[in-house]
Design a protein with these regions (language model features):
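Short hydrophobic beta-strand that contains or immediately precedes a catalytic carboxylate
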Residues: 48-51
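Acidic, metal-ligating active-site segments
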Residues: 53-91
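Long, contiguous domain-sized segments
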Residues: 1-42, 46, 78, 94-278
């Protein structure tokens, strides 16, 4: 079956790719080029913190053994906040708990760093979280107005909808330029006037991967984003802030970690338990 699919894919490769690009690909890329603002950041020495969370679980006779962590880490490796919880119950809301812990870590970090970087998209926070969590997040962000959301990928299709874009915005910017800089600021009032998201796609040096930068609120100008790029440039690894890489590495709960948790509780010897999949 797989071989047949692969052979068919080879035959239809160009046809499939043409669907992704769509009939107005060149027109959209031209628009993306005109949206691009050339800017080469200058390193600025500031304290930057990165925040990320992780959760994992394994089922056990109708219940789940789970663990959730969230950390805030400075670019030099100093851990500012280390939050963690675990338990054994049924249907735990792990994503919501991880989000709450991220918000708590953010609230503790805004006074300890000049710039606080949150891993992921503000869109996903507002789309998938309870209203109470969204309100808590807004309060954390507006406490010092120094919180920035950074993501390596993006599925948003906002900037080229009127041109019949099929792929996400980031696809067209990737094809438009390899130069350092950023796209024109896009403001999205989808979640209401108190939750407007202002965003740009940015490349901090030539040929580096694009990242998406999101801020809460409206009225930002190009200089506001340039200042952010200057602040995060010093500790960039492959185009991505090192503080966020450290946060990810420090909070990640692997299946191996979960297996240790199972062993500590003696559940691996219980009837009906199953090995954590690697």
């Amino acid at each position: 079956m797989l071989n047949s699919v692969l052979k068919d894919a080879i035959k239809k490769r160009d046809e499939t790719l043409s669907i992704l690009k769509g009939p107005k690909f060149e027109q959209i890329v031209k628009q993306a080029k005109s949206n691009w603002i050339y800017f080469s950041p200058t390193k600025q020495d500031v304290v930057v913190a990165g925040i990320d969370s992780s959760f994992n679980s394994t089922k056990f006779q109708g219940a789940e053994l789970w663990a959730v962590t969230a950390v805030s880490v400075k670019s030099d490796g100093e851990i500012l906040v280390d939050l963690h919880e675990h338990g054994l119950d049924s249907n735990p809301e792990l994503a919501s708990l991880a989000s709450k812990m991220e918000i708590d870590a953010c609230l503790e970090s805004v006074d300890k760093a000049e710039l606080v970087l949150m891993d992921g998209s503000l869109y996903s926070q507002f789309l998938t979280r309870q209203k109470s969590l969204a309100n808590s997040l807004v309060n954390a962000i507006t406490k010092k107005n120094n919180v920035v959301f950074v993501s390596k990928t993006s599925n948003t299709k906002k900037q080229f909808e009127n041109l019949g874009a099929i792929a996400g915005d980031i696809f067209y910017y990737n094809h438009a330029t390899i130069s350092p800089g950023f796209s024109k600021i896009h403001e999205d009032p989808k979640f209401g006037n108190d939750m407007i998201i202002s965003s740009v796609f940015a490349r901090l040096a030539e040929s580096l991967p694009l990242i998406k930068i999101e801020l809460l609120g409206s009225g930002y100008d190009n200089d506001d984003f340039k200042l952010i790029f200057n602040k995060i440039l010093k500790n960039i690894i492959s185009g991505y802030p090192y503080a966020l890489k450290l946060a990810h590495n420090n909070c990640k709960i692997s299946n191996k970690d979960l297996s240790k948790l199972v062993s500590i509780h003696g559940l691996s010897n219980e009837i009906g338990s199953r090995e954590v999949l690697e």
